[in-house]
């Protein structure tokens, strides 16, 4: 089993996509990249942390390249600290890797994707230094609250788009 930690806007949205994939063992939303021991409130107030999803996956069933390809389909990797109406440094596009092999794969992936995108890709690639699990009420949010307003307005259409692709 391997882990990759991705930040690409609201962590509810990113988790909702990846927790449904064959080969993904588990997902968990959390925070990374900023001050120690963050809370949702501190992250929203700009403590430097990013909303992220830790994806535990079986690389024999779903390779990292497939995960990154889907990641680039579900968020705008050319947008600086913003995804849709969600604005702030906590929504930046970032790939946190745990080993050099994944770093190189991510770098090569972005290099190839840049040839497709007309705007500059701003997705950062960084070694995972710290990760803090988010509060329990954030875990598997869409799965637990599919009828909530944000879920219906933002997440459900994203899932429908992915399923139709």
From Swiss-Prot:
InterPro entries: Met_Sox_Rdtase_MsrA_dom, Met_Sox_Rdtase_MsrA_sf. GO terms for biological process: protein modification process. It catalyses: L-methionyl-[protein] + [thioredoxin]-disulfide + H2O = L-methionyl-(S)-S-oxide-[protein] + [thioredoxin]-dithiol; [thioredoxin]-disulfide + L-methionine + H2O = L-methionine (S)-S-oxide + [thioredoxin]-dithiol. Keywords: Oxidoreductase. SUPFAM superfamilies: Peptide methionine sulfoxide reductase. The active site is at 10. Its EC number is 1.8.4.11. Pfam families: PMSR (PF01625). It is an enzyme of class 1 (oxidoreductase). GO terms for molecular function: L-methionine:thioredoxin-disulfide S-oxidoreductase activity; peptide-methionine (S)-S-oxide reductase activity. It comes from the Bacteria. Belongs to the MsrA Met sulfoxide reductase family. Has an important function as a repair enzyme for proteins that have been inactivated by oxidation. Catalyzes the reversible oxidation-reduction of methionine sulfoxide in proteins to methionine. PANTHER family: PEPTIDE METHIONINE SULFOXIDE REDUCTASE, PEPTIDE METHIONINE SULFOXIDE REDUCTASE MSRA 2. This is Peptide methionine sulfoxide reductase MsrA.
